[in-house]
């Protein structure tokens, strides 16, 4: 009842470990919630933390520091009933972001009593010409020309060409705007510009920052491949990932 932690297991794997950690009653508002999960946020008295770091030879908080603290000190949990997700895998990261662009997102950025502020960038507002956006989140500084965006997240400085289509995808954007001279130089090397090329179709994918997707590219994973490594891309948990600074030439199909 006091919220004191008397046992802790980092990433329990077996039924026996889970059974040992089940609480006799729900700690929050959900009657079916019978476990406490660590969010990885810890508050220490400075002197206590110093003593632990000196006395424990290992340095992993979850595996070593916290278990030692529980053995010898009073450790208490602050129960949090709000939105929290572990996004340590490609699939979890993808699902969490795509859910934000749904009609009923799990987390709301725009609550008047608790708005979320991002880092100030002083970028111009996004410009969209002849676009159709349905359930989309579009960050600042983008230029989107006659594109169709459905349940997708579009990051800062994204350049999306004419007639491109995004479905259930995450486009991380870019760290910079490409100058005309740089675009010409890359074109001479048959390298597409930063952004999503005209006529490209992207479905259930994550496009990392500064990626170059050429004209008429199709990223769809129609075969439903779960795990694969390709040239300029990889697939994890069925999600196609274009890595940072990746290049997908025009006409390529994934």
Which residues are covered by each model-predicted region?
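Left-handed beta-helix
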Residues: 24-32, 47-254
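Conserved core of the sugar-phosphate nucleotidyltransferase
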Residues: 1-42, 56
């Amino acid at each position: 009842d006091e919220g004191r932690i008397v046992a802790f297991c980092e990433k329990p794997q077996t039924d026996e470990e889970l059974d040992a950690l089940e609480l006799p009653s729900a700690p929050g508002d959900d009657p079916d919630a019978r476990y406490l999960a660590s969010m990885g946020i810890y508050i220490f008295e400075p002197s206590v933390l110093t003593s632990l770091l000196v006395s424990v030879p290992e340095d992993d908080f979850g595996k070593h520091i916290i278990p030692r603290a529980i053995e010898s000190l009073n450790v208490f949990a602050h129960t949090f009933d709000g939105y929290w997700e572990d996004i340590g895998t490609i699939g979890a990261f993808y699902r969490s972001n795509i859910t934000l662009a749904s009609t009923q997102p799990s987390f709301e950025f725009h609550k008047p009593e608790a708005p979320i502020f991002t880092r100030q960038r002083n970028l111009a507002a996004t410009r969209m010409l002849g676009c159709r956006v349905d359930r989309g989140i579009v960050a600042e500084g983008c230029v989107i020309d006659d594109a169709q965006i459905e349940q997708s997240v579009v990051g800062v400085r994204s350049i999306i060409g004419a007639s491109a289509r995004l479905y259930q995808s995450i486009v991380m954007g870019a760290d910079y705007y490409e100058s005309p001279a740089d675009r010409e130089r890359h074109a001479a090397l048959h390298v597409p510009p930063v952004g999503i090329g005209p006529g490209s179709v992207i479905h259930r994918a994550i496009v990392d920052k500064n990626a170059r997707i050429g004209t008429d590219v199709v990223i769809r994973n129609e075969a439903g491949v779960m795990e694969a490594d390709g040239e300029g891309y990889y697939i994890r948990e069925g999600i196609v990932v274009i890595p940072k600074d990746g290049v997908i030439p025009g006409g390529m199909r994934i």
